[in-house]
Design a protein with these regions (language model features):
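Nucleotide/pyrophosphate-binding catalytic subdomain
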Residues: 1-130
């Protein structure tokens, strides 16, 4: 099984039309590969969330991480929905579902290990993991 990783930043997923374009790009590679898609939050979302955190004045790094990752989760869900609507079997995975093991340094964590068993199992029934 050949697997590729495709990464799209905030500008590439800035609105639904752009997410549809990403889905088309992914669809072109489906015949050759199983695909892992990594997405940023939609353009401007992370900045907006950061402003909310600053307004509250939070010094709680774990909550900051939780809030900031919500932007990526929206993009991931929307793309997976579009791919499935296009009849491309897709599922979503968050870091803890993979799992990706990091150190405990919130906001600046380093990856210690990626256990790929869940990814490989998911590819038995899906063509794309977002």
């Amino acid at each position: 099984m050949n697997i590729i990783v495709m990464k799209f930043g905030g500008t590439s997923v800035g609105n639904i039309s752009k997410i549809k374009n990403v889905a088309k790009i992914v669809a072109k590679e489906i015949k050759k590969y199983k695909i892992i898609v990594v997405l940023s939050a939609m353009g401007g979302v992370t900045n907006k969330l950061q402003k909310y955190i600053e307004e509250i004045g939070s010094n709680f790094a774990s909550e900051n991480d939780l809030i900031l990752t919500s932007g990526e989760q929206v993009s991931v869900g929307l793309l997976s929905m579009l791919l499935n609507k296009m009849k491309i079997k897709s599922t979503t995975m968050l870091g803890w579902q993979v799992p990706i093991i990091t150190d405990s340094c919130h906001e600046k964590a380093k990856i210690l290990n990626i256990d790929n068993k869940n990814i490989l199992n998911s590819f038995k029934t899906n063509n794309v993991i977002v």
